[in-house]
Amino acid sequence: MARSGGNDGHEEELDPELFEEPSNLEGYEDGEFEEDEEEFEEEEEELEEEEDEEEEEEENVTTDEQSGSPKSSQPVKLQSSDVLDCPTCCEPLKRPIYQCSNGHLACSSCCQKLNKKCSFCRCNIGDIRCRAMEKVIEASIVPCPNAKHGCKETTTYCNQSSHEKVCKFVRCSCPVSNCNYVSSYSNLKSHACSTAHVWGEDDIHFQLVIDRPRIFNMNLGRKKTVVFKEEKEGDLIVVQAFKGLEGVYVTVNRIAHMAPGIRDLSCSLAKLNEYSTLRSGSLVKKIQKVREKMHLEDDLMWIPPKMLSGDHWKMQICIAYGYKFIHI
């Protein structure tokens, strides 16, 4: 046993365990205890999710406790909804929301794009959650923008765009060039079938029967849009042609809302030439108004220059319900 000399000249016995190396440090030099950066980030995300769940449970408990108290919550009206938007990208804030040491806010997406640097003061941001603002966002309930047209749905402020995409009361515009009629999908169909609807001289339009092919002409020199009205239901199908550097692109869309409940339409399209035919099949996409420019996400039929003879050519179309493509 080790001994140590004291001030009085006597030796004291020391516990040998004090001089033993800790067993839990074995392998430290070999790097066995080094944490992988990706694993650390995953653990951090899991901790954040657990914190969110615990926070929601605490909020529910608090709400239950407060429900029995005489003081009840009251709705609050904001003068401007801008305070609920990310000050950097101006999009609605949603959890997780972060703040820098100076109190500036940013959404999770902006934190990543700016490499965790505050866009206002350049301080670090992306580690400190702003729980208070997250509670405000979750409690912010707004009516649908189409409430005045009959929609009774309400959503949180950060999720209103998701509802707008599938709202059946969304405004649909008549595709006829000289008509300014805007209303719901059902009203638009009634409008197209009524005698009050007037087709202009420059508007190219045809009646259309489901499952029955129809030949029509397109003339890029005069009009790049052809409108078909389905004979029974009154659905409006819009065929548009867009000139490109490498030929012409043709799209087929339907004026309708995106809400579930209406049957999908499929389209079989053919470009007719004297010695050859170009065919294409796709689902008919729903839009709310005629587009002035081509969208790359649309299903397109590409017609190469060698199949074009001037601005006037002949095409054939067949519309069917569901995923049904008819060879034409």
Curated annotation (Swiss-Prot):
Its EC number is 2.3.2.27. Zn(2+) 1 binds at C144, C151, H163, C167. InterPro entries: Sina-like_RING (IPR049548), SINL_plant (IPR044286), Znf_RING/FYVE/PHD (IPR013083), Znf_SIAH (IPR013010). It comes from the Eukaryota. Residues 63-77 have a biased composition (Polar residues). Pfam families: Sina_RING, Sina_ZnF. Belongs to the SINA (Seven in absentia) family. E3 ubiquitin-protein ligase that mediates ubiquitination and subsequent proteasomal degradation of target proteins. E3 ubiquitin ligases accept ubiquitin from an E2 ubiquitin-conjugating enzyme in the form of a thioester and then directly transfers the ubiquitin to targeted substrates. It probably triggers the ubiquitin-mediated degradation of different substrates. This is E3 ubiquitin-protein ligase SINA-like 5. It comes from Arabidopsis thaliana (Mouse-ear cress).
